[in-house]
């Protein structure tokens, strides 16, 4: 009897394992076929079960603030586990930005729609972006120029009416810093950058499940460090040379 049970269990295991392999092969083929197949594309099998750390940025901040301040369905953030899977896992964006692009690996994160793949945009960068939440790192020209290229292009896409999504690996620090800058800038332009708004920015950051306690306060401190010496708008004007007109136009997209 025991032998029969063991044989039956082994059969079930082999069957399920075979089905899993077939499914993984299907996902890989579906992901890689089509346009841009000459690129090195990142497929994250963990996307089958892993938390995407996905959220609409404005909706998340509104929830944290306790009041609907920002227009939603403009921009979202996540981890990189979605790569190789349906764009539906990250809200079906029009444009995708990959903050974690590595010029050494040249691996492109992407999602697929029914008829095409949406490839994460990156720029002619020489480094992998890291530690953006530490303001002293913005003195590094390569970090500054690359980060500003992302911010400038994100603003352009939002102004054009496109739904934007950006991600890093965990969707935590790099994504958190870009989120903090965007919300900090927009709220400052509307005289809403108060203690409650800074708390909301930090609250959005802490929604990431992989965040460890020692990182608590990083987004709050980042915004406060900028505000010690200048406005966030002046910080972006100085570091990124983004025009005041573009800042005004993107502000109107978030708050009518």
Roles of regions detected by a PLM:
Residues 1-6:
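Short, Lys/Arg-rich N-terminal segment immediately upstream of the first membrane anchor
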Residues 7-165, 177-256:
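Cys-dependent protein tyrosine phosphatase-like superfamily
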Residues 170, 174-175:
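Ser/Thr-glycine-rich phosphate-binding loops at phosphate-binding pockets of nucleotides
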């Amino acid at each position: 009897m025991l032998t029969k049970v063991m044989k039956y269990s082994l059969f079930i295991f082999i069957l399920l394992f075979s089905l899993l392999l077939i499914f993984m092969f299907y996902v890989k083929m579906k992901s890689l076929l089509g346009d841009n197949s000459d690129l090195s594309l990142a497929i994250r099998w963990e996307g089958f079960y892993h938390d995407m750390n996905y959220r609409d940025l404005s909706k998340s901040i509104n929830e944290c603030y306790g009041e609907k301040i920002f227009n939603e369905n403009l921009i979202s953030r996540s981890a990189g586990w979605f790569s190789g899977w349906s764009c539906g896992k990250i809200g079906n964006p029009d444009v995708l930005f990959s903050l974690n692009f590595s010029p050494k690996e040249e691996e492109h994160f992407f999602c697929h729609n029914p008829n095409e793949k949406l490839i994460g945009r990156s720029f002619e960068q020489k480094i992998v972006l890291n530690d953006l939440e530490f303001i002293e790192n913005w003195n590094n020209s390569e970090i500054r120029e690359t980060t500003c290229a992302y911010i400038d292009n994100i603003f352009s896409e939002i102004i054009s009416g496109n739904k934007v999504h950006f991600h890093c690996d965990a969707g935590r620090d790099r994504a958190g810093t870009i989120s903090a800058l965007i919300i900090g800038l927009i709220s400052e332009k509307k005289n809403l950058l108060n203690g409650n708004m800074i708390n909301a920015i930090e609250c959005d950051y802490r929604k990431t499940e992989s965040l460890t306690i020692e990182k608590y306060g990083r987004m709050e401190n980042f915004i406060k460090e900028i505000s010690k010496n200048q406005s966030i708008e002046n910080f972006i004007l100085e570091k990124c040379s983004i025009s005041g007109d573009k800042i005004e136009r993107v502000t109107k997209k978030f708050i009518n």
